[in-house]
Swiss-Prot record:
Subunit relationships: Homodimer or homotetramer.
Pathway in which this enzyme or protein is active: Amine and polyamine biosynthesis; spermidine biosynthesis; spermidine from putrescine: step 1/1
Name under which the protein is recorded: Polyamine aminopropyltransferase
Subcellular location, record wording: Cytoplasm
Pfam families: Spermine_synt_N, Spermine_synth
Keywords for this protein: Cytoplasm, Polyamine biosynthesis, Spermidine biosynthesis, Transferase
Gene this chain is encoded by: speE
The species this protein was found in: Halorhodospira halophila (strain DSM 244 / SL1)
Length: 278
């Protein structure tokens, strides 16, 4: 790290992203990963796990809104939601903006990520004390495998990159377990890296795994996240019946909460397929 800057380099792609920083305000080695928090000059606080940018306060809303609202508005009546990963709690915040959601279970392997977020990113953790929220710190792979069949409406997989402990979240076996836990019309959304950098290494294999797991439809959402490699990110939507392009449009336009990025037009546009992903 050059003095005064934090840099995340993607060596294989010959690209790097840097943020000017004022100071590192927290550092620890948890049981699972190296956790750092920086105060940047213009992007608010920065959360870094094992050297990789997880979020900045300036652009976190882009990722968290798009990982939550398209799936929730695509489901006809989302009441039971599970988040696998999501330790920073930003997706939990967005999910519980929906008044119809009755219960959301967040299953995060590393409790320290959540506790660090509660201390240094309180705006992400505003739903942690919601009576509809349940935080559980355990292995998401095992939890999904043991989940009651047809007990969930929406599953959101907010994992780190598909290496190490997170690699199992991108497999046919895991997605088969997720599909079993979903009720009719159930939806899973999973972060799937950059369309520009990871089309062949992540997105295409995840689509194949989802199809092999028996999902009726597999779709890619694309959206900007400037602090992530390439600045262009994706999530993969997998459905047990239905089509996320046929969403509750009126509800999304009259939602009883404010968003900074997501709306009905963005929902439609994010599901449009660029030529390079066809």
């Amino acid at each position: 790290m050059r003095e005064g800057w934090f840099t995340e380099a993607v060596e294989d792609e010959g690209v790097a992203f840097s943020l000017a920083i004022d100071e590192r305000v927290h550092e620890e080695q948890s049981e699972y990963q190296h956790i750092e928090v920086y105060r940047t000059r213009r992007w608010g606080r920065l959360l870094v796990l094992d050297g990789c940018v997880m979020l900045t306060e300036r652009d976190e809303f882009l990722y968290h809104e798009m990982m939550a609202h398209p799936a929730l508005f695509a489901h006809r009546e989302p009441r039971r939601v599970a988040i696998v990963g999501g330790g920073d709690c930003g997706i939990l915040r967005e999910v519980l903006r929906h008044p119809g959601v009755e219960h959301t279970l967040q299953v995060e392997l590393d409790e320290r990520v959540t506790r660090v977020a509660e201390t240094h990113f309180p705006d992400l953790c505003t739903a942690n004390d919601d009576e509809r929220a349940e935080l559980r710190f355990t292995d998401g792979l095992r939890w999904i495998r043991e989940a009651e069949p047809e007990s969930l409406d929406v599953v959101i997989v907010d994992s780190t990159d598909p290496v190490g402990p997170a690699a199992g979240l991108f497999t046919k076996e895991f997605l088969t377990d997720v599909r079993s836990a979903l009720g009719p019309g159930g939806i899973v959304v999973q972060q799937s890296e950059s369309p520009l950098l990871h089309r062949d290494s992540v997105i295409a294999p995840l689509h194949r795994a989802a199809s092999e797991a028996g999902f009726d439809g597999v779709h890619t959402l694309t959206f900007p996240v400037p602090s992530y490699p390439s600045g262009w990110w994706s999530a993969t939507l997998m459905v047990n019946g239905g089509d996320p392009r046929n969403f509750r449009e009126a509800d999304s336009e009259e939602k009883p909460f404010e968003t900074r990025y997501y709306n009905a037009d963005i929902h439609r546009a994010a599901l449009a397929v660029p030529e390079l992903l066809k």
